[in-house]
Amino acid sequence: MNIWLNMLTTTGLGAIIGGYTNHLAIKMLFRPHRPIYIGKFQVPFTPGLIPKRRDELAVQLGKMVVEHLLTPEGIGKKLTNEEFQKGLIHWAQVEVDKVIKNEQSLRHMLEKWNVAHVEEEVTQKIEYVITEKIQAFLAEYYTYTWEQALPHSVNEKVENAIPNVSAFILERGISFFESEEGKGRLSKMIDDFFASRGTLLNLVGMFLGNVSVVDRVQPEVIKFLGQDGTKQLLTDVLQKEWEKLKGRDVKELESFVEKEMIVSSVLSAVKVEETVSKFLNQSVQQVCEPVRETIIEKVVPSTVTKGLKWGTENVESILNNLHLAEIVQQEVSTFSTERLEDLVLSITKNELKMITYLGALLGGIIGLVQGLLLLFLR
């Protein structure tokens, strides 16, 4: 009976000592949190291993994350994974569609995003761009002649239209002189002419008798305007004037209309401020609805795919610029010792328990072996 009691005692003591030793060793990883002094003498193994080496642990964790966890190869594989890409595209389509279907006005949406004075800025920007474009256009075209500035098609149309313009002018002239107003104007012109010639009117009156001068001149004027020769003459005159105009510099226009006036006229016609205001007062849905399907089905997938491709090609540079090792190091360094202990224990709790149990098991086995040795030695 004493033999079995001795074996049980040695086994139990060995298990208790082995289990408690491992439990104490685990506790000493974290505790005490601060060094303990007896007078000026620091007690050995204080503070615990992890509190003592926390800064080194932070550095090593940062290196481990960068070198073994968040590697360019691992992230690159994830970004090129077909299922991941499909999921990301679907998520992006859903989120973009929510924005597109928003019934709030663009103005309200921009205010929510803290984008202030957008209307004034957009108006000024558009007016600035228009002004710059007009001035650049004028600066270029002022170096040309009209023949160089006008498109060839316009030149052809003008030249083809000259005979028609001549015919139109003559037709309007005939219609005018056939009217009472035209006859009156012609009569006044004749009277003014003879008034400046003195007795010439009396001499003409002797030849014409009772018929007025205007009645004789009016048919001749109309006849003259209706002749083909007159039409050709006017056409030739217009053609010569057109050729002269084509040879003149466009810059001559500046003496009649200043650049600032042209810019001001264009801006007034465009009504930029009014247009921008109307645009911003529209809802997001109204603005995007005409192109909604294109955005969802084409733009979003294309943008996501290109973004992932760019990310894959530049993942190493991105990770380097993020300085992940420093981020992890800084975060771990800010942890209190208690939080760091809780973090490690939450991950390794079961394993540490098993280490304690293993210590008890080994201690029990050693105690049992000791008991057996004592038995045989007796």
From Swiss-Prot:
TM ranges: 357-377
Keywords: Cell membrane, Membrane, Transmembrane, Transmembrane helix
Membrane topology: Single-pass membrane protein
Protein localization: Cell membrane
InterPro entries registered for this protein in UniProt: DUF445, UCP032178
One Pfam family here: DUF445
GO CC annotation terms, alphabetical: plasma membrane
Sequence similarity: Belongs to the UPF0754 family.
Name of protein: UPF0754 membrane protein BCG9842_B4423
